[in-house]
Amino acid sequence: MNLFARIRFYYSAFIISLIVSIMIPLLYFFPKKKSKILHYGNKAMLALLFAKVTTVGKPDDRAQLYLINHQGIVDIITLEALLNKNLNWVAKKELFEVPWFGLLLKNGEMISVDREDRRGLIKLLKDVKYSVEELHRPVAIFPEGTRAKNQKMLPFKPGAKFIAEKYCMIVQPVVIVGSKSVVNEHEKTSEGGNLKVIYLPSIDVPNASKDWYDQLRTDMQKIIDQELEQYENKR
């Protein structure tokens, strides 16, 4: 294993922990500035990780639900740094109990979901509806449900599809490529490099085809494969 990549990983972990420890009290004492605190805090974090971001496409201001592929914490950092939209992230209940990061989720008033409790889906539906309709906060979900260990996307969980269809939402898919090279939590390495964020055309779910969700996973994986192939060809 490259020693420098391991050192960079621990540097990255320190930077993330430092910025998070600053954001936690700020979110608590200045709740009305929540969106700006998260936006600029993550923007500073991304800069200190020396990650260069290229974007393709544009975020849709109408989007109520963002569906993003998931490789690690850098996905969240990147989207928060790019979008000043007070995103409401859906995260499993266990993450709210993690030291530091759990406090960030709680003070950021994010949505927790208990996968082991059947009532968890009912709570999730209520929380999403309240977020979108009352707070006007778009919701962000990783449809895979957890981090992929490689560039192959995991099967999509049914929850995001159910939510989008129940509330007739406008969904914008987002593909993030390169986050694992910036911080690889599985291998505890960091090689730096470029991030590419691709905003796909929004999906008006009530007017979409019945297989829109399955097709979306296929389309997102195809984009990831194409980006990786282009990267290899440039080396």
Go through the PLM ranges and name each one.
Residues 1-54, 103-107:
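A transmembrane-helix-recognition feature enriched in membrane-embedded lipid enzymes
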Residues 16, 20, 24-28, 61-118:
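Catalytic core of membrane glycerolipid acyltransferases/transacylases, capturing the structured
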Residues 41, 75-78, 100, 159, ...:
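Hydrophobic alpha-helical segments typical of transmembrane helices
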Residues 52, 88, 111, 138, ...:
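Residue-level detector of anion-binding/catalytic polar loops
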Residues 55, 111-114, 205:
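Short acidic-hydrophobic, aromatic-tinged amphipathic segments that line or gate anion-handling sites
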Residues 55, 66, 89-90, 197-199:
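Generic preference for hydrophobic
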Residues 98-102, 122-124, 199:
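Short, charged, surface-exposed secondary-structure boundary motifs
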Residues 124-235:
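Non-catalytic C-terminal accessory region of glycerolipid acyltransferases
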